């Protein structure tokens, strides 16, 4: 009976992974690569184009769904730290499969001060290697002012997430400056 239970559990887990389009970190855009350019509509039905942000540091984070507890915590953390991001010339972009209407509702309810993009066709999620069948994986790409991905985060606790991201940017900036001086 125990073996039957374990076998069924393993089959269910494997089926879920296959159906969800499970992606491993090896599928993500690699550190050191140029961030793929894309265009998507934001919550206000305005087109966001990554090429318009050339020369800016970027946080591009993919999240599963609007109104989920995890994303609410993550988004509100970015909202609360937004002025620090702006002082450091860093733009924040959130992306999910949700439709614009849902993104707009979520943004208004939580008073978000950054753009949230709708990738309902899953095209950008595929470009960045975070696509799954049901929703994109929770992954954050940190991009320098040259458009190069310098960090990929998929395992950080959501507590103080936005503050920790700022520290990663500051550390990268110090390391980049040291490399220039050498």
Report residues per predicted region:
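A short beta-strand-turn-helix
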Residues: 38-58
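Thiol-/selenol-based redox modules, centered on thioredoxin-like
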Residues: 137-182
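Short hydrophobic alpha-helix segments
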Residues: 51, 128, 152-153
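N-terminal targeting signals for export/organelle localization
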Residues: 1-41, 175, 182
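Short, internal strand/loop/helix patches
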Residues: 91-93, 104-138
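Short pre-active-site segment immediately N-terminal to redox-active cysteine/selenocysteine motifs
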Residues: 56-58, 63-67, 99
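Short loop/turn microsegments at loop-to-beta-strand junctions
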Residues: 35-36, 57, 137-139
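Conserved redox-active cysteine motifs that mediate thiol-disulfide chemistry
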Residues: 62-80, 84
């Amino acid at each position: 009976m125990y073996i039957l239970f374990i076998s069924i559990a393993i089959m269910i887990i494997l089926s879920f992974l296959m159906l969800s389009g499970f992606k491993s970190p090896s599928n993500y855009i690699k550190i050191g690569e140029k961030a793929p350019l894309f265009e998507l509509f934001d919550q206000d039905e305005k087109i966001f184009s990554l090429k318009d942000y050339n020369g800016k540091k970027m946080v591009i984070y993919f999240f599963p769904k609007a109104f989920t507890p995890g994303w609410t915590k993550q988004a509100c953390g970015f909202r609360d730290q937004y002025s620090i991001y702006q002082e450091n010339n860093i733009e924040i972009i959130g992306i999910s499969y949700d439709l614009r209407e849902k993104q707009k509702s979520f943004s208004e309810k939580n008073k978000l001060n950054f753009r949230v993009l709708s990738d309902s066709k899953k095209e950008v999620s595929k470009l960045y290697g975070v696509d799954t069948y049901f929703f994109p994986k929770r992954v954050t790409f940190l991009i320098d002012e040259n458009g190069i991905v310098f960090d990929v985060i998929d395992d950080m606790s959501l507590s103080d997430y936005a503050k920790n991201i700022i520290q990663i940017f500051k550390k990268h900036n110090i390391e980049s400056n040291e490399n220039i001086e050498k």
